[in-house]
Amino acid sequence: MGLLRIMMPPKLQLLAVVAFAVAMLFLENQIQKLEESRSKLERAIARHEVREIEQRHTMDGPRQDATLDEEEDMVIIYNRVPKTASTSFTNIAYDLCAKNKYHVLHINTTKNNPVMSLQDQMRFVKNITSWKEMKPGFYHGHVSYLDFAKFGVKKKPIYINVIRDPIERLVSYYYFLRFGDDYRPGLRRRKQGDKKTFDECVAEGGSDCAPEKLWLQIPFFCGHSSECWNVGSRWAMDQAKYNLINEYFLVGVTEELEDFIMLLEAALPRFFRGATELYRTGKKSHLRKTTEKKLPTKQTIAKLQQSDIWKMENEFYEFALEQFQFIRAHAVREKDGDLYILAQNFFYEKIYPKSN
């Protein structure tokens, strides 16, 4: 090679180096393409093997037990917190139930009491788990979280929920009790005739707008323990956080309801197929708005935010929001201002023993 450099003119040497570099780049490119082709082939073989295994299991004959197919045996519980867009979301479930072939049932408790007696807890658990005629089922109602496992149930229902900024939720509830909403405008409300604004209520130290009224989302997630309903309990908040992470399939926020619906449709299409499109383009009959609602002033908000109860409820809300946004970030991608659900991003390979 050294002799060649001596004998070759500089221009030819440069051309030789360039030609060698181009050849190496070409080879690297071809190797990369071969690697990609090999990976695609491995994935295709893996998918084929999975299909063969599934077919073999299908050909083995019907399942020996008499239980329903898993999707047909599914039960969802939406233990809805008042004034979190719960009626708007529930009406989407009602709009889809005939088309998607599932049942929707409202859990109506006496005086809307979110805490059930022990005997009612047992009845409720037995009803939901054994009522096969109502499966697949979507149950909704203003009931605090109930741990099915402690009643000896093997297959627990899927819990979902939506929560809201605690002050916004309280303001909405305050005006709802006085003026109702556009969903049932003729219904007489409990506080109808009271024209006092939320700002005036807070300024006067009224009971309907007291910080204690903020304590609702934490106990709904905490459950049926007495400490859950002890206003300002740190234990209750910690338990609510634990349940949100470990016992709830998905918890959305009112402020991002469409994204919550989109994630449910992607993960649970048996119930929510078509829900996103219905929410975006439907006649909006499912939407519900409190009437005569006036936004609170900055002074009113600042006064409520001085409360330790608000601080805890807000901490729980921020915790739920962060978890929801984490789930969404791993499930969707944004393009041209719109969100798109990601396709399946895993596959199986190296499946043994090999099929004949």
From Swiss-Prot:
UniProt subcellular location: Golgi apparatus membrane
Post-translational modification: N-glycosylated.
Enzyme class: transferase
Predominant cellular place of this UniProt entry's protein: Golgi
Positions bearing carbohydrate: N108, N127
Segments on the Cytoplasmic face: 1-11
Disulfide bond entries: C201-C209, C222-C228
Enzyme Commission code(s) on record: 2.8.2.-
Pfam families recorded: Sulfotransfer_2
Gene Ontology biological process terms in this record: gene expression; heparan sulfate proteoglycan biosynthetic process; heparin proteoglycan metabolic process; ureteric bud formation
Domain of life where this protein originates: Eukaryota
One GO molecular-function entry: heparan sulfate 2-sulfotransferase activity
Coiled coil: 24-51
Any single Gene Ontology cellular-component annotation: Golgi membrane
KW rRNA processing (keyword) present: no
Keyword vocabulary terms for this entry: Coiled coil, Disulfide bond, Glycoprotein, Golgi apparatus, Membrane, Signal-anchor, Transferase, Transmembrane, Transmembrane helix
Binding site for adenosine 3',5'-bisphosphate: K83, T84, A85, S86, T87, S88, R164, S172, Y279, S285, T290, K293
Family that this chain belongs to: Belongs to the sulfotransferase 3 family.
Subunit-structure text: Homotrimer. Interacts with the C5-epimerase GLCE.
Protein task: Catalyzes the transfer of a sulfo group from 3'-phospho-5'-adenylyl sulfate (PAPS) to the 2-OH position of iduronic acid (IdoA) or glucuronic acid (GlcA) within the heparan sulfate (HS) chain and participates in HS biosynthesis. Required for metanephric development of kidney formation, suggesting that 2-O-sulfation within HS is essential for signaling between ureteric bud and metanephric mesenchyme.
Protein name in UniProt: Heparan sulfate 2-O-sulfotransferase 1
